[in-house]
């Protein structure tokens, strides 16, 4: 059966750089969306969500480094255009990247689309050296590669016994953690996506304890699509000062398509009290295929989740998943 593909065409008078670098912003288009411009340089720059925009820029460079085999790092944010709407937004970021241990710098453009508010769920579709083009930007709304990346599922936290399976998990050594700063980026972005007003001081008090990486093959994915789950155990030392649990966990799923260049990140975090998969459930997953729970089992799992996250948070999460999704980019 043929697939229908729809496109969003940028306004003709403003298509020369795909939504980047417009100091006057972009007027309201036919779909009632507009871009607002923010400068990040100068003596007293004022722009919203400073940490979030910085991390989005770093994710773009991370994507470029993975696909191109480079090691560029963020030098400075220069400006960004933010799509103004009532839900998830898009960020057209212009930044300066540097090569470590050298004075070389290059201007980059990064485009990030948020899929929802209140949790880490984003797609990076552009990460490139700055260019100008006279070709309008066409974004497919529906295509097979992106449909697979739209899967929202995150796995349950594996049992401690499961982490002993070296064929399934790679336990990151301390030396590897220092050399792979993207792991901390994933953790900090997961928290900031949930609370956009977290300070740099707060984030500095996160202490990573253990990291396990799992590479999986999804049945519906193409050969060029790779899925990685990153399991992070960490201490939130700032929470200790107010009497909350210090030991916490986070899961981040990365999906990257090496052909299209699309990078999707989905993440969540919680205190160490959240229930995990038992050894029996782990055995069922590994040897019995898909789990089938009866109503009583589903009810018990729901009660455990509500007990940890509080009922109001569960309602709020359901509201976000239903209503606050990006309608277009």
Swiss-Prot record:
- Keyword S-adenosyl-L-methionine listed: no
What UniProt keywords apply to this chain's record, in alphabetical order? Developmental protein
InterPro entries in the record, alphabetically?
MS5
Highest taxon in the source lineage = Eukaryota
Does the keyword Metal-binding feature in the UniProt annotation? no
Q: Which family does it belong to?
A: Belongs to the UPF0725 (EMB2204) family.
Functionally, this protein is described as follows: May be involved in embryogenesis.
Q: What is this protein called?
A: UPF0725 protein EMB2204
Q: Which organism is it from?
A: Arabidopsis thaliana (Mouse-ear cress)
């Amino acid at each position: 059966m043929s697939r229908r593909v729809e496109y969003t065409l940028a306004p003709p008078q403003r298509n020369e750089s795909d939504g980047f670098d417009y100091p006057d912003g972009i007027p309201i288009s036919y779909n009632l969306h507009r871009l607002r411009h923010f400068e990040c340089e100068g003596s007293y720059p004022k722009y919203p969500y400073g940490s979030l925009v910085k991390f989005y820029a770093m994710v773009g460079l991370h994507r470029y480094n993975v696909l191109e085999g480079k090691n560029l790092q963020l030098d400075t944010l220069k400006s960004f255009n933010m799509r103004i709407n009532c839900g998830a937004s898009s960020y057209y970021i212009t930044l300066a990247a540097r090569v470590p241990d050298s004075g070389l710098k290059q201007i980059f453009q990064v485009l990030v689309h948020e899929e929802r508010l209140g949790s880490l769920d984003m797609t990076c579709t552009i990460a490139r050296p700055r260019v100008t083009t006279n070709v309008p930007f066409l974004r497919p709304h529906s295509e097979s590669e992106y449909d697979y990346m739209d899967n929202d599922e995150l796995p349950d936290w594996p049992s401690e016994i499961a982490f002993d399976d070296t064929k399934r998990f790679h336990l990151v050594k301390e030396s590897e953690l220092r050399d792979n700063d993207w792991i901390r980026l994933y953790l900090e972005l997961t928290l900031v996506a949930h609370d956009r007003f977290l300070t740099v001081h707060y984030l500095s008090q996160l202490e990573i304890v253990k990291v396990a990486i799992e590479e999986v093959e999804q049945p519906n994915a193409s050969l060029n699509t790779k899925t990685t789950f990153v399991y992070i155990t960490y201490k939130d030392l700032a929470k200790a000062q107010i009497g909350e649990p210090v030991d916490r966990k986070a899961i981040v799923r990365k999906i990257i398509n090496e052909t299209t260049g699309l990078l999707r990140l989905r993440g969540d975090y919680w205190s160490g009290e959240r229930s995990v998969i038992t050894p029996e459930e782990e055995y069922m997953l590994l040897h019995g295929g898909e789990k089938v729970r009866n109503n009583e089992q589903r009810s018990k799992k729901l009660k455990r989740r509500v007990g940890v996250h509080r009922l109001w948070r569960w309602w709020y999460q359901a509201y976000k998943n239903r209503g606050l999704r990006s309608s277009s980019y």
